[in-house]
């Protein structure tokens, strides 16, 4: 297995998240060393199997998780931009969880405070990225999406 997430990569992911979050008027995230470690460990596990799948919820406590895979070495901004691009499929008039918008909603979830990031390269050169969010977003209780995923400010 190859390269792991660098401080620069983690900061790129954080910066992009916080720029997008500012557009929605929600507080910035802070990098968390513990979440970075956990995300890094899981990205390395994904790279070793070359299978992209979410970790069991029981193994990540109250954390949410976004995953990304590419056949090349991804930048932090590339990953965040791809996740955020799901906004085009999100219906702010009928807020809620859908599988095609979950990366976007996790990124801008208002009540999330911390993020951890991991990146690992597989033997074939592909890269696996894991973002862990605390506390988790995408909670489907009544009114939670309306409260936590505001539309971008004009």
From Swiss-Prot:
A GO term for molecular function: protein homodimerization activity
Classification via SUPFAM superfamilies: PR-1-like
Segments of this protein annotated with the region Interaction with CAV1: 91-98
Predominant subcellular localization, coarse grouping: Golgi
Localization: Golgi apparatus membrane
The entry's keywords: Coiled coil, Golgi apparatus, Lipoprotein, Membrane, Myristate
Family in the record: Belongs to the CRISP family.
Record protein name field: Golgi-associated plant pathogenesis-related protein 1
Species of the source: Mus musculus (Mouse)
Record gene name: Glipr2
